[in-house]
């Protein structure tokens, strides 16, 4: 079985994340959407809320023969991948700055777990500037994020911030 993890904070999940998931589907038999619990950050949504939103959104994808699983973790991505029996870590790249960061992370992950490969997918042009942090910032300042995050996520952002 070709199993991969797609790790991230997903705070919140964006259409850029969904694009990477969709484009990963033909490459793997199973993809674990691995929601990072980082106690050093103050997220908009709890890990449980993020996992619940992702679980609600994933059935809208046409995933063919690929099974999609949502799980959460804390600690080292490479260790989580190994524990789940994954052979690959999927990462989206939006710009050169992402590549520089992701290359360092991929090399460290390879050092920690040499049997796990990192697969980079270039962001679709229409999402090349979209990040969770930018979506939160724009939303908090009263800007529109429709078309950049799933409708469910936008509704939950309105609920969370009372806007």
Located regions from the model:
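Nucleotidyltransferase catalytic core that binds NTPs
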Residues: 1-163
């Amino acid at each position: 079985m070709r199993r991969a993890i797609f790790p991230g904070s997903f705070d919140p999940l964006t259409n850029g994340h969904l694009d990477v998931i969709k484009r990963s589907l033909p490459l793997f038999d199973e993809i674990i959407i691995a929601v990072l619990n980082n106690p050093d950050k103050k997220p908009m949504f709890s890990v449980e809320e993020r996992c619940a939103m992702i679980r609600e959104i994933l059935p809208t994808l046409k995933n063919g023969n690929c099974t999609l699983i949502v799980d959460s973790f804390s600690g080292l991505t490479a260790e989580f991948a190994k524990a789940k029996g994954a052979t690959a870590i999927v990462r989206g790249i939006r710009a050169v700055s992402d590549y520089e960061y992701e290359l360092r992370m991929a090399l460290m992950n390879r050092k920690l777990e040499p049997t796990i490969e990192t697969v980079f997918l270039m962001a679709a042009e229409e999402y090349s500037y979209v990040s969770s942090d930018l979506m939160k910032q724009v939303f908090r300042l009263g800007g529109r994020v429709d078309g950049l995050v799933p409708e469910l996520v936008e509704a939950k952002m309105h609920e969370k911030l009372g806007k």
